[in-house]
Amino acid sequence: MNNIIPTEETHPLTWRLRNDRETVWIEEYCKKNGYFSLKKALKTMCPEDVVHLIKESGLKGRGGAGFSTGLKWSLMSKDNSSKIRYLLCNADEMEPGTYKDRFLMENIPHQLIEGMLLSAFALNVSRGYIFLRGEYIKAEYILKKSIQEAINFGFIGSNILNSGFNFELFLHTGAGRYICGEETALINSLEGRRANPRAKPPFPAVFGLWGKPTCVNNVETLSNVPSIVLHGVNWYKKLSKSTDTTGTKLMGFSGKVNNPGVWELPFGTTAREILEDYARGMKSGLFLKSWQPGGAGTDFLIEKHLDLPMDFTSIAKAGSRLGTAIAMAVDNKTNMISLVCNIEKFFSRESCGLCTPCREGLPWIVKILESLEKKEGHKNDVKNLERLCLDLSPGKTFCAHAPGAVEPLQSAIKYFRLEFEAGISIKKLKKCSNILGIQSNEFTSKV
């Protein structure tokens, strides 16, 4: 295993971590160059300078989509007639198998807060909210205490560091809905409405929280901002081994590996390096059957893809998405039907129910998979699953929930079709008629 020695020059997100993994509170954070970036920005830069810096750095969103952060910031409404603008931190980390944001919030909370302060300064925002997953009880306590610490030290409030910059920061805990990870559903929830996605346009940058210009960024994205402001664009670009994406990324492996965890690594590090050098390989007696690059809502890949660089373009070319870059290893003793069925049950339960394809399609997928799992499937079940994947593909539903939900299913069928076909009942195979239209797969056929 590689022995990581985090330094400020090579590990901007994690070099402040304590060896005992206790929280880095504000006094220790300040001793480790904490809030230096904020002081630099407020004293020597204007908001436009910070936006330009982030755009030039190539920082991409770390929530999964990989959209340019600087470009997203530049889309904020330039209409200064509206003095009220909002910055929202999406900390509603509910993607199964993902835990990177919790890692940052519980260990280095002031890095996130400083990132929000810098982002707010760049966007002329005076109020921010951290929308936290409700189940993150420890993170809630730590963030509340950290916000109060920042207020006491004069980093949050009015006329921060005598600069004329004002910023209030509030913590809001969610009610346990996965769909709040979608930025407009998050906004609806924060307003006290049902957590349904909104139609776009208008985009939040123009019409967001309470109808005001709003920017929504992920925890890890915001945590990258202080180091970029402090050390500059050229330094940040050199951190990466990829020609596609700049900087570093929290990456990890879970599943039946010897050392599951999360590590800050350069973009371009291969999945094999992470699995073998950091996660120490599969447990004794097991070998890798498949893996998901970045959460439950990403397509499965197989062993031959382990040598791909972990960046947005390389993983996309292989037919999946980098997502959160917290990978899940699937071992050879895992039944793919059972695994995918479990994933689809989660996504079916978490559908907001707004659009018909998602509301009706995902439960039907679960029903078919349950039959296949019991080896009671029907002749056309696998074909119907493939058709449902097409029916729930991008552009056919109101948001990206359903398209993401069927990614693991379509890829599992692609690579492990025989396992799914093995779930078809021999008896029903002999006596079977085609399913006409969208209806239950439980039917009787004429003999």
Swiss-Prot record:
It catalyses: a quinone + NADH + 5 H(+)(in) = a quinol + NAD(+) + 4 H(+)(out). Binds 1 [4Fe-4S] cluster. PROSITE patterns: COMPLEX1_51K_1, COMPLEX1_51K_2. InterPro entries: NADH-UbQ_OxRdtase_51kDa_CS, NADH-UbQ_OxRdtase_suF, Nuo51_FMN-bd, Nuo51_FMN-bd_sf, Nuop51_4Fe4S-bd, Nuop51_4Fe4S-bd_sf. [4Fe-4S] cluster binds at residues 352, 355, 358, 399. NAD(+) binds at residues 61-70. It comes from the Bacteria. Its cofactor is [4Fe-4S] cluster; FMN. SUPFAM superfamilies: Nqo1 FMN-binding domain-like, Nqo1 middle domain-like, Nqo1C-terminal domain-like. It holds the Pfam family NADH_4Fe-4S. One of its GO terms (molecular function) is NAD binding. Keywords: 4Fe-4S, Flavoprotein, FMN, Iron, Iron-sulfur, Metal-binding, NAD, Quinone, Translocase. Its EC number is 7.1.1.-. FMN binds at residues 174-221. NDH-1 shuttles electrons from NADH, via FMN and iron-sulfur (Fe-S) centers, to quinones in the respiratory chain. Couples the redox reaction to proton translocation (for every two electrons transferred, four hydrogen ions are translocated across the cytoplasmic membrane), and thus conserves the redox energy in a proton gradient. Belongs to the complex I 51 kDa subunit family. NCBIfam families: nuoF_fam (TIGR01959), PRK11278.1 (NF008436), PRK13596.1 (NF010120). Composed of 13 different subunits. Subunits NuoCD, E, F, and G constitute the peripheral sector of the complex. This is NADH-quinone oxidoreductase subunit F. It comes from Buchnera aphidicola subsp. Schizaphis graminum (strain Sg). The gene is nuoF.
